[in-house]
UniProtKB/Swiss-Prot annotation:
Belongs to the oligoribonuclease family. InterPro entries: Exonuclease_RNaseT/DNA_pol3, Oligoribonuclease, RNaseH-like_sf, RNaseH_sf. SUPFAM superfamilies: Ribonuclease H-like. This is Oligoribonuclease. 3'-to-5' exoribonuclease specific for small oligoribonucleotides. It comes from Corynebacterium glutamicum (strain R). The active site is at residue 141.
Length: 219
């Protein structure tokens, strides 16, 4: 029996509900000195089903650009094998950006730009905005940051936080994306209201309770 038949996973959601998951590896965190050296992207529907093969590209960097890495980043990229692949790669950043844009065009509705999704993605978005502006324009200004859910789980449901799936810490872009999708899937199962969700009446009651609680701040 398929997942859709036993109702554990809803059917693939509409094109205007997609999420674009992007993870970057850089030579550091300074937008002016450091460059993107690995780009990975996957598209999921609203139910976190991965659509298609995605993008997984190592971007060439010059020796001068690699020399900007500090000791921590140097050791991280060397131990993962990324540094050698950067030197061997002939892929330009524009080509990597083109590949992600093609992925978005294939799976997403251009009339409804998809949010960027990932883990602690503010830095990734900053590098996208600075070094891949066409990709930035193709994404919705809103973002889905799994680390925000993580922080709420830590405060509200510590057991959920401490039982989250362990990460491999590969420090490679595609592996990081898959781990982020898996983590959000875990939170959806353990943290959020089970399907089919609350009734309209329950939502109305909860909304009124929230309004009542914070009403004094609006007096």
């Amino acid at each position: 029996m398929s997942e859709s038949e036993n109702n554990t996973t809803p059917a693939v959601a509409a094109r205007d509900d997609r999420l674009v998951w992007v993870d970057l590896e850089m030579t550091g965190l300074d937008l002016k000195r450091h460059v993107i050296v690995e780009v990975a992207a996957l598209v999921t529907d609203a139910n976190l089903n991965v659509l298609g093969e995605g993008v997984d590209l190592v971007v060439h960097a010059t020796e001068e650009e690699l020399a900007q890495m500090d000791d921590f980043v140097t050791n991280m990229h060397e131990s993962s094998g990324l540094t050698e692949q950067i030197r061997e790669s002939a892929v330009t950043l524009k080509e990597a950006e083109d590949a992600v844009l093609a992925l978005i065009e294939k799976h997403c509705d251009p009339a409804h730009p998809a949010p960027l999704a990932g883990n602690s993605i503010a830095t990734d978005r900053a590098f996208i905005r600075e070094q891949m502006p066409r990709l930035d324009e193709a994404l919705h200004y809103r973002m889905v940051d799994v680390s925000s859910v993580k922080e709420l789980a830590r405060r509200w449901y510590p057991r959920v936080y401490y039982k989250q799936p362990e990460k491999g810490l590969a420090h490679r872009a595609l592996a990081d994306i898959v781990e982020s999708i898996r983590e959000l899937d875990y939170y959806r199962r353990s943290f959020f209201v089970a399907e089919p969700g609350p009734t309209s009446e329950q939502c109305a009651d909860d909304a009124q309770a929230a309004v009542d609680r914070f009403a004094p701040y609006f007096d």
